[in-house]
Amino acid sequence: MSTSKKVYCNTILNRISFFGFLLCSIVTCKANNTQGVYYLDLDICNERYPNSEQYLVPVSFRDGTLCVYPDYHTETQIRTPMGLDDTFLLVDRLGLRLPTPEVVDSIYSQADIRLAPIPMPPTSEMTTRAYYVQHDSLIDAQLAQSGYPNDPEILQSSQAKLITGHKKDVVYIDRNSSRVAIYGWHRLTGELIQPYSTVHHDEYFDYSHGIRPVSPEVFKDGEWVIWSD
C-alpha cells in the first residue's frame, strides 16, 4: 500500500521482526464493511521525511503511526545535547519536531531496547563535552551487553531498533520560551527520574539531555495528519 492510496481504517501498529529485520507495519482496516489487512510500505516514514539523519521507525500514537528517531541525535557518532535554539534549527532542517511527554511515554512503552539510566555525579563538569562523551561510552557498553551492534550505520538502515531509557528527552516548548523543557529518563520499573521540568534556561544542556526528533504528522486512516500538542 502506498502513502497516496486512501484507505479508511483504524490503525493497529505491529512491528514484526524476522532475523532482526523490520518487515512491515500492519494496518487493520474496515472498508466497505469488509475487514482486511493491508501492509504499509516499510519506508513510509522515510519517504515522507527524506531529510532525516536516522532511519525513522514507526510508533503507534493516537490511533495512527508516528515516525521517530530510533536513538538520540548524534554528532561524530556521539549522542550530543545542545541549546534550545540549535535544537529548533536541527528539527526544522529535518522537517521534524520535538516530542511531547505523551510521545516520550509512547516511545518508551513500545521500545525494542530499554536501557537502565546511568546518572553521573552532578558536578560542574556535567555540561562539558568530556562528560557527555564519557556518558555516551557507558551507553554503548550497555548496548553491547544487550547484543545490539555498535555500528553507527545501523541507525541509517531498516535494522535500526528503537532504543530508550538512556537520556532525558528535550520536549516541545514554545519557541519564544526562555526555558528548556525536559522529561523522562525512565527506570526499568517505568518510574520517571525526570518529571516535566522547565527549571533550566533555554540554552542550558548537560550530558543527560537527549534530542529525539519525531514527525509532525501521524499516518492515520490512509492520510498524513498534523497532530497537536
Language-model regions: role of each:
Residues 133-216, 223-227:
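Intrinsically disordered, low-complexity, charge-dense segments enriched in Lys/Arg
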Residues 12, 21, 29-85, 112-113, ...:
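Short, compositionally biased
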Residues 1-13:
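N-terminal secretory signal peptides that target proteins for export/translocation
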Residues 26-27, 102:
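Alpha-helix/helix-capping structural signal
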Residues 17-25:
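Bacterial N-terminal signal peptides
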Residues 84-154, 213:
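Conserved hydrophobic ligand-interaction patch in extracellular adhesion modules
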